[in-house]
Amino acid sequence: MAEQGLTKKPATAKNHIFAIGGGKGGTGKSLIAASIGICLAARGSEVLLIDADLGTANLHTFFGLEPPKIGLSDFVTKKKSTIGGVVVKTGINNLKLISGAKDMIGIANLSYGQKARVLNNIKRLKYKYILIDLGPGTSFNILDFFLISHCGILITSPEPTSIENTYRFVKSLLFRYLRKTINQKLVKSLIDRGVRQTSGQKFDSIFDLLEAIEQIEPNLGYTIASYLSTLDIKLVINEVRTDRDRAIGEKMALVARKYFGIRIDFLGSVSHDANIRKGLLQMKPLMAYFPHSKAFKEIDEISQKITPAYQLDLDFSFD
């Protein structure tokens, strides 16, 4: 009965999907997603960027592009029958884009059926690397986009509010992960109460939740803990200015281990660069002002750390 109440499916992905998120807006997720995409494409890999910051998409601006005439909403509304039909060029060899800039009002609130169709089709895309740039917040849509990835990359800045929002994102992600993985109704109900923190049910750490689950289903808590260990989550600290800022990454990784019982690998930090904002205001392509900066070199180093062939044991499906 070691795996009672859990669903497990073998992964069949032939691509490597990376989701880039973090909970708070303004931390530089889009910049880092675009830059990693450029680095991977420069090494000869076929790369696709997906702007899933639904409702406030801006990834096209990092390539000096006007809002593309086709975008993700055309696939969502079935104006385009295939997701490949909304892919556009970025002007960089080997690097393509699915833009969200044309998205209609309400796109941020995808129905379950719409989300399932998008996620399942993303998994079938034949690119070596797929980078999904997520919007801020902890909605189910954002969490589910993060969970289909082989590797999730959290982007935060040294500010306390950004760090706090990252922890909140991780906690929400784990509860969502368990909610979608566990079939046992009583355990699902327990998780739901913990998320809402109703009826006096509050879990300060994932270990409190696992202990409560053990009371309902002996041994299931241990099994869930082993499944949590399969999550591949990374962390990048953006906009760093001091050595103290750079030290935050390792500290956050330790906190994640202590309170969430998961391993988060600190990939590195990215230096503050005032020229980035200047370039964006002038609608200049990222490559025109960024490739020789210290920040870009740091992102290039990060891109080299995430390129091994990741393969999840758990594969979420949205049928």
Language-model features: locations:
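P-loop/Walker-type NTP enzyme "switch/lid" segment
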Residues: 52-128, 197-204, 214-217, 226-229, ...
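Conserved catalytic-core segment of NTP-binding enzymes
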Residues: 135-265
